[in-house]
Regions:
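Basic, polyanion-binding surface patches
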Residues: 1-227
Length: 227
């Protein structure tokens, strides 16, 4: 209906906000707080949250939130004039509060302990820790890149873009000696290679990729070409 939400009005007035991240334990209360209560109604009380004073800004923090960010509003960018167009609020974090219960043994935030949720469309939300998986980051290494992968691998219908990304993330292609030793010590790979069936060979390599073993996948794929 093109009305302005109280959050935006408060941002424009105070030029300060607190961003409280939402985890699964508080999602129902957060949903309740999104009710269009009249201006002036204390939504902390309505949602059953605990308001605690901030240190560097005027707005209160939500005690139940595992991470609270005190922010100064730098810019408000209108994304349109029609109903539902929205606004982009650019903020500077001036104080960060982290509940130590969400930290792992290394002092970093554990994605399982923080148990974040995200808002989707309609009534739908997503619980982050139920969809966790790891992707190795090439921060300390220099991957050879997909462009260095032979065409017979890149053009195969068996390998996905993710598979090619894994193959391209190794630092060096295995040597002939490394491949020979690998094949010699692996009877299953020997059997697949003896069939000379390219599809079966590539499927075997894909098994290694599915198990996050790109180096062995390379050895399977190149074995026949170094004999």
């Amino acid at each position: 209906d093109n009305t302005i939400k109280h959050t935006l009005i408060n941002c424009e007035k105070t030029k300060e906000v607190v961003i409280n991240v939402v985890n699964y334990d508080m999602v129902q209360q957060v949903s309740l707080s999104s009710t269009e209560y009249p201006d002036g109604v204390n939504e902390f009380l309505k949602a059953g949250f605990t308001a605690i004073a901030s240190e560097n800004v005027k707005p209160y923090r939500v005690a139940e939130s595992p991470v609270q960010m005190e922010c100064k509003v730098n810019q408000i960018i209108a994304l349109g004039t029609e109903g539902g167009a929205g606004n982009l609020i650019v903020c500077e974090i001036v104080k960060l509060h982290i509940n130590e219960d969400i930290l792992d043994e290394n002092g970093t935030i554990s994605p399982e302990k923080i148990d974040l949720v995200s808002r989707l469309g309609g009534n739908w939300y997503s619980r982050a820790k139920e969809g966790l998986f790891e992707v190795e980051k090439p921060l300390a290494t220099l991957g050879i890149g997909v462009d260095a992968i032979p065409n017979f691998i890149k053009e195969s219908a068996i390998f996905t873009g993710n598979d090619l990304g894994k193959l391209g993330n190794i630092e060096t292609i295995p040597t002939e000696e490394e491949i020979a030793i690998f094949v010699q010590n692996n009877t299953q790979v020997k059997a697949v290679l003896s069939s000379t069936d390219e599809v079966k060979i590539q499927q075997k390599a894909k098994e290694y990729l599915n198990n996050e073993d790109a180096l062995s996948a390379w050895k399977v794929l190149l074995a026949q070409r170094v004999e």
